[in-house]
A protein has these predicted regions:
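Loop-to-helix entry region of an early transmembrane alpha helix in multi-pass inner-membrane enzymes
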Residues: 82, 90-112
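Transmembrane-helix signature of polytopic, membrane-embedded enzymes
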Residues: 114-141, 157-158, 174, 315
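Hydrophobic/aromatic-rich transmembrane helices and adjacent perimembrane loops
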Residues: 156-159, 195-196, 330-358
Length: 526
């Protein structure tokens, strides 16, 4: 029955090749995802920060109350951790590890992104080949220096794609309200996903001035209501989510250029297909552009009227490319903005519109290129990294043995790579991976006036740092664990009179190895 409902296009050899290649890729993706899903080690340097806030919710604590800051700190939205804590409470009788469960939620978000991409392509082309290829390409959204990282990224991408999907099908005011709600929800998942409002608004201008106006008004109303409630419930949220989040970013033009080069090199079949589709679809567009601001009798007419209605995904490709020129300079992320924002909408639009190309040979060449480059090269060599070898695992286990011996000595762990070990062994979590971000905020009277909680956090952090430095300078901490990125630097600890007794090289995800150090007072060592 299910097979009968699908109106398959007549497959040629290229169609079978694309379908088979996508199926094999998905199988490989599932196998490697399972490996990274159950890994007891961090899949990314700051992964535990996402677990830490979920833990706070499970313990009934307010993660955005300055009482808990520092050492706790989290700059992303709360929707993913809150959802995870609620679901985790429902299945508490299963006794599943929280890290494993949150990774599973993130992986589910990846699958949902692939599903909605495939659904949109299938709706527009009625081709299972194009739909399956879109599903496979979209799986890249889950990559963040490794697979199955417990981050809110994939949930944010799913809500972003769902917003575009629903916006394209707006018919009533209720539909507009739903799209506005999803738009605002995306901000509270991870802040930059709210950018989805731009392509939605632009597209509505080509459709109906009234709908565009309603969308803006409903979105503003929804945000004001949500912000009022959240500011009451979580006093420090907006200070952290806006002020601190903007302060942590360091930017590099060379970092952006490297990512654009990778995108151009391995996604050139999709990019070429995009240009061909846009040219063929809009080459005969009327040169007359009618712009009307009259909200009277023609309020249901578009603000900008063209002979060919632009596609919301084509607009999204253009908008997100411009956005990436800014976000892509952020040195804290490599390719993730491109994978999350640009690639999904690029895949959806190009594969939905590929049949506009009349020459089958050209279409086949682009499809084969897409499979070989955009899917397999990126997928197998970047999205699916090699497994951790026995030597790398032994490094982790040797460090765990050292920490097991130090547990009763008052050890303090300042490496986020070992934050889960600290939590599992009832030790304080002194650095969850984002604790260091507290110190990035610069003093500003304007910021203090608009976001008073930001000033409170800065003052509390200063007192906490002074107390910590006092404890170190008087050797009150017998054992300190840091790494090469820790905010407790090696130079500071050496000046304070601490010496390294052990150093271990640890692998986390696909990033270069991190070096973890064990420090004790030099006088004790001597």
């Amino acid at each position: 029955m299910i097979m009968q409902r699908i109106n398959f296009k007549k497959f040629n050899s290229v169609g079978y090749f694309c379908l088979g290649a996508s199926a094999v890729y998905c199988l490989i993706f599932i196998i490697y995802s399972f490996y990274w899903l159950i890994s007891p080690y961090p899949n990314e340097y700051r992964e535990f920060a996402n677990i830490d806030i979920t833990r706070m919710f499970l313990e009934g604590k307010n993660p955005y109350d300055t009482v808990n800051i520092p050492p706790f700190f989290y700059v992303y939205g709360f929707v993913m951790p809150l959802l995870t804590s609620w679901l985790y409470s429902l299945i508490s009788f299963i006794h599943i590890d929280l890290l494993l469960f949150q990774r599973l939620i993130a992986l589910s978000g990846t699958i949902l992104c692939g599903w909605i991409s495939a659904k949109e392509v299938k709706n527009q082309t009625n081709s299972i080949v194009y739909a399956f290829l879109a599903f496979s390409i979209t799986l890249i959204v889950g990559w963040s220096m490794g697979l199955c990282v417990a981050l809110p990224n994939t949930l944010g991408v799913f809500v972003m794609l769902l917003t575009l999907y629903k916006a394209k099908r707006i018919k009533t005011i209720t539909d507009i309200c739903g799209v506005s709600f999803l738009t605002i929800l995306s901000f509270f998942i991870k802040q930059y996903f709210v950018i989805v409002c731009v392509p939605v608004f632009i597209w509505l201008l080509f459709r109906s001035k009234k709908q565009a106006l309603y969308y803006v008004l409903f979105s503003i109303f929804c945000f004001i209501c949500a912000a009022s409630f959240i500011n009451y419930l979580y006093p420090a949220f907006f200070s952290i989510a806006i002020v601190h989040h903007l302060a942590i970013a360091s930017h590099s033009l060379s970092h952006l250029i490297k990512q654009l080069a990778v995108t151009g090199l391995f996604y050139f079949p999709l990019l070429l297909l995009f240009l061909l589709v846009v040219y063929n679809r809009y080459k005969n567009i009327s040169g007359k552009i009618i712009i009307s601001f009259n909200l009277g009798k023609d309020r249901n007419s578009p603000l900008i009227k063209l002979s060919e209605m632009p596609d919301i995904y084509a607009i999204s490709v253009c908008v997100y490319f411009i956005v990436i020129l800014r976000l892509g300079m952020h040195e804290g992320a490599y390719m993730t903005y491109i994978y999350q924002l640009f690639i999904p909408v690029l895949a959806i639009y190009t594969l939905s519109s590929i049949d506009i190309l009349k020459k089958d040979k050209l279409k086949n060449v682009v499809l084969i290129g897409t499979v070989l480059f955009s899917l397999y090269h990126i997928g197998l060599f970047i999205n699916i990294p090699r497994e951790m070898n026995d030597r790398e695992k032994s490094e982790w286990e040797s460090l765990y043995k050292i920490l097991d011996a130090d547990k009763t000595k008052g050890v303090q762990i300042y490496s986020p790579l070992l934050a889960k070990y600290a939590w599992d062994n009832q030790l304080p979590v002194w650095n969850n991976g984002q604790t260091e971000y507290i110190s990035t905020l610069q003093n500003s009277s304007v910021i203090s006036h608009i976001f008073p909680e930001a000033n409170k956090i800065a003052l509390k952090n200063r007192d906490w740092q002074l107390q910590l430095h006092q404890q170190i300078s008087t050797f009150q901490i017998p054992v300190i664990i840091t790494d090469n990125l820790s905010f407790l630097t090696s130079s500071f600890l050496k000046q304070a009179g601490y010496c390294i007794t052990d150093s271990v090289s640890l692998k986390a995800g696909t990033t270069p190895n991190y070096t973890v150090y064990r420090w004790i007072p030099c006088q004790v060592r001597n």
